[in-house]
Amino acid sequence: MKAQSKRTSRLLILLGIAVAIIVAVFVWRHFSATPDGSTGAQQHAVGNNPARAGGRRNMPMPPVQAATATEQAVPRYLTGLGTVIAANTVTVTSQVDGQLMAIHFTEGQQVNAGDLLVEIDPRPYQVQLTQAQGQLAKDQATLDNARRDLARYQKLAKTGLISQQDLDTQASLVRQSEGSVKADQGAIDSAKLQLTYSRITAPISGKVGLKQVDVGNYITSGTTTPIVVITQTHPVDVVFTLPESDIPAIMQAQKNAAKNNTTVPVEAWDRTNKQMLAQGYLLSIDNQIDTTTGTIKLKARFANEDDVLFPNQFVNARIKVDLLQNAVVVPTAAVQMGNEGSFVWTLNDENKVSKHLVTTGIQDSKQVVISAGLDAGQRVVTDGIDRLTEGLQVEVVTPRSADTTPTDAAEKPATAEKATHRRGEKSATGASAGSTTTAAEKS
């Protein structure tokens, strides 16, 4: 009896489990098998939010920014690292020995050629000049006396009162005295020159550096220690290097400039390549290539009237070698790199995007020349590229201006949200009966 009772209990339990499973399957099928193929849970959620239902059927188009490819005349530049050097540099030293008596310049001062820089004690050279002048006077008197004696000897020789030998001897004395006078004149000129050297003047116009010798020191000629260094920075030069592969373009640019009676323009930019410092022209090209680096040296000249370039300053030199006419140009942000190479996303009249492979040319931080794959007038996407797929329709928006107020910026998203909500309500009105039922059940 107990065994039969246990079997009956088990059957009832199994029957209850079976009924529960059947009910669960029925309920699941009831909520999931809706007319539009969506699950019951989804329909329930949509019924609670009609705007959301409409949003799923009318997803907003992804916003992008676009630009139009244009035709421009684009200059071609070659860039190399350069060093500013003075057009002329003079190391001022003394040509005479003596004590430094006075300095007539201020360190860093701009001087002109001929300006007095320093004075060396002139007294020893004044004494030498006086001595030379005295010796000249003495020898000149001897010469005058010898010439008078020679004139007498010549008269006596005609009468036969003196021999020819005496006449020749007197003539030799005259020539010796003439030689002494010339030597004395040379000594005077030398003393005057030494006296002139005691006043050292600027050989060129330029800026003086820091003085290397102080007043009171004894200076010797031929010493390696300079008194001061003068650099000419008006104008100033920039020496820079370019790869040897650029030589043909440089030579062609020089030929074109010569035909037009102009020069090849060169720009000097700062170390970061963000600010142009000065504009000049190509002065010369070295006559040989550096085999170690495979580069060639070039020299450009700049007026440097505002002293923006300083000797030994590092700059980036940009030389303009060509001007590309009718080049197709797009913003740099429009060009992307993929496995197949460079490409851009173009827009048709319906604002649908299409991927185009392109060949790029000259480019900088703002724009890129498209050599092939794109025509002027085509629109390209410049922002929002990461959301694009082939054939996707997008909404072209304009970038917000910098002067937009925070209130304006806040109102725009709110307006867009209201528009989306209206589209959702409109879509919810035409929703399926299952969705409407779900919304009614919640209410």
Swiss-Prot record:
Compositionally biased spans, kind Basic and acidic residues: 409-419
Bilayer topology annotation: Peripheral membrane protein
Signal peptide start-end: 1-24
Main location: membrane
GO cellular component, one term: efflux pump complex
Keyword Lipoprotein attributed: no
Keywords attached to this entry: Cell inner membrane, Cell membrane, Membrane, Repeat, Signal, Transport
Subcellular location: Cell inner membrane
UniProt GO molecular function: efflux transmembrane transporter activity
InterPro entries membership: CusB_D23 (IPR032317), Multidrug-R_MdtA (IPR022824), RND_pump_MFP (IPR006143)
Low complexity composition bias: residue spans: 427-443
Protein name stated in the entry: Multidrug resistance protein MdtA
Organism: Yersinia enterocolitica serotype O:8 / biotype 1B (strain NCTC 13174 / 8081)
